[in-house]
């Protein structure tokens, strides 16, 4: 209050006083809320599991997994220095920077780390078609994948450019999801467990979706 910490519930607040509330965010980034929604929607149990976060960036997905009870998360990102400090210092997090999710293989991981029962994906500027094949090689039999579908990176360049990078046509959303389902089930032999719309829009205002996939063999 008035740039001073109010420590007593009995402190008097006058009409001219300036009151500021300091709200601590639950996750280190908005991505945490997106994954949290998917985990609840698809009834995915995380507690006691090891997981991989492809496209970790600041670490919203990683943070969400840890808060849900993951015992180990390998945070993979092609960039460097983006992961939140609290996650970088967490002994449960394996920081794997400057690692392209498209080309990640079992040799990138320490002995005994693989396979894992759960992989989450939040990648930009690349289609999930180029990420999922690598993810499968890291996944346990009957393991699960939760991936964020970003239509602007799945649709054709002309469609994305037409909306200045924003895909607003529901028909394009439906087509993108349908084509991804066909790819995942027919070519990768994954089970398509379902899809749900993200509770938050992407940075540019794009609608995003989360898909739940399961490995069968």
Which ranges hold each PLM region?
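Short alpha-helix
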Residues: 173-188
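Core SAM-dependent methyltransferase catalytic element
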Residues: 200-217
């Amino acid at each position: 209050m008035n740039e001073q910490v109010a420590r007593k519930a009995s402190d008097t607040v006058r009409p001219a006083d300036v009151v500021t509330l300091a709200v601590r965010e639950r996750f280190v980034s908005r991505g945490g809320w997106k994954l949290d929604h998917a985990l609840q929607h698809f009834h995915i149990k995380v507690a006691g599991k090891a997981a991989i976060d492809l496209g970790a960036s600041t670490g919203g997905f990683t943070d969400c997994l840890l808060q849900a009870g993951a015992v180990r998360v390998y945070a993979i990102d092609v960039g460097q220095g983006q992961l939140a400090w609290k996650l970088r210092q967490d002994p449960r997090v394996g920081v794997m920077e400057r690692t392209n999710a498209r080309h990640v293989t079992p040799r990138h991981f320490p002995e005994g780390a693989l396979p894992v029962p759960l992989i989450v994906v939040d990648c930009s500027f690349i289609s999930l078609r180029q990420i999922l094949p690598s993810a499968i090689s890291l996944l346990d039999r009957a393991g699960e994948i939760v991936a964020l579908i970003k239509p602007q990176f799945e649709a054709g360049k002309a469609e994305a450019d037409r909306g200045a990078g924003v895909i607003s046509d529901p028909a394009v959303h439906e087509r993108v999801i349908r084509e991804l389902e066909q790819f995942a089930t027919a070519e990768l032999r994954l089970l398509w467990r379902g899809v749900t719309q993200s509770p938050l829009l992407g940075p540019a205002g794009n609608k995003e979706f989360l898909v739940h996939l399961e490995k069968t063999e």
